[in-house]
UniProtKB/Swiss-Prot annotation:
The lineage of its organism: Bacteria, Pseudomonadati, Pseudomonadota, Alphaproteobacteria, Hyphomicrobiales. Is synthesized initially as an inactive proenzyme. Formation of the active enzyme involves a self-maturation process in which the active site pyruvoyl group is generated from an internal serine residue via an autocatalytic post-translational modification. Two non-identical subunits are generated from the proenzyme in this reaction, and the pyruvate is formed at the N-terminus of the alpha chain, which is derived from the carboxyl end of the proenzyme. One of its GO terms (biological process) is phosphatidylethanolamine biosynthetic process. It catalyses: a 1,2-diacyl-sn-glycero-3-phospho-L-serine + H(+) = a 1,2-diacyl-sn-glycero-3-phosphoethanolamine + CO2. It comes from the Bacteria. Belongs to the phosphatidylserine decarboxylase family. PSD-A subfamily. GO terms for cellular component: plasma membrane. The modification Pyruvic acid (Ser) is found at residue 190. It is a peripheral membrane protein. It comes from Brucella abortus (strain 2308). Its EC number is 4.1.1.65. Disulfide bonds: none annotated. This is Phosphatidylserine decarboxylase proenzyme. Catalyzes the formation of phosphatidylethanolamine (PtdEtn) from phosphatidylserine (PtdSer).
Length: 232
């Protein structure tokens, strides 16, 4: 086993998006330390925090087209019916929406909840309200991704918040995504909304902890027991 493999297997991986910021914090730490020794250690604490912020642990994703997997780490903050953002072109009828709120300590990498092809990616500028507020879905800055999945179109919306003011999405229209594949991140937390067809059965409840790429939010199967939440 090589040294690189040993490091990779011993420590939590860091996403490449974080490399410039980690390097920047480290260089600033060296400069501050040259001016005054205690400042070096303060800078190193911030560098370690930056490393923690951009951690990107591997996940074991269920490979089942009947499942919808959480796109984000965090807490389920909403389960119910809601009209999807207009830019997704999903119509004006309410759809099942599951929202996952990410705090500043969550893993910030976002993963595709389903396998499918991206129909469109639309970025909308907006406000930076508390992402836990319901109106943040329509008023805050957001990035909307429409995916054509084996069970139809679903919407995945990355929403900025009070602290999170930088949404990153490196996937583009016509890209093919695997379930659990990384497609973006939101710096300093915030929220991700998933809009599902009405025939999806929700398997999570408000307040439940979700793990990106692993937690089952909903499914289309008929033999998986009673749903956690019925959407009427």
């Amino acid at each position: 086993m090589s040294l690189t493999d040993t490091i990779r297997n011993t420590f939590v991986p860091i996403h490449r998006e974080g490399y410039p910021f980690i390097a920047g914090f480290f260089v600033v730490s060296l400069i501050l330390g040259w001016l005054w020794d205690p400042l070096f250690w303060i800078g190193m604490v911030l560098t370690v925090w930056c490393i923690y912020f951009y951690r990107d642990p591997e996940r074991v994703t269920p490979m089942d087209d009947d499942l919808v997997i959480s796109p984000a780490d965090g807490k389920v903050s909403f389960v119910g019916l809601a009209v999807p953002p207009a830019e997704l072109d999903l119509g004006y009828e309410p759809m099942t929406r599951v929202s996952v709120f990410m705090n500043v300590f969550s893993v910030h990498i976002n993963r595709s909840p389903v396998r499918g092809k991206i129909d469109k990616v639309v970025h909308r500028p907006g406000k930076f309200l508390n992402a836990e507020l319901d109106k943040a879905s329509t008023e805050n800055e957001r990035n909307s991704v429409l995916i054509e999945s084996p069970h139809g179109k679903i919407g995945v919306v990355q929403i900025a918040g009070l602290v999170a003011r930088r949404i990153v999405c490196w996937s583009n229209q016509d890209d093919e995504l695997s379930v659990g594949e990384r497609f973006g991140l939101i710096r300093f937390g915030s929220r991700v909304d998933v809009y599902l067809p009405s025939d999806a059965t929700v398997r999570v409840a408000v307040g439940q902890t979700a793990i990106a790429g692993e937690t089952v939010l909903a499914d289309y199967g008929t033999e998986r027991g009673e749903p956690v939440v019925r959407i009427a």
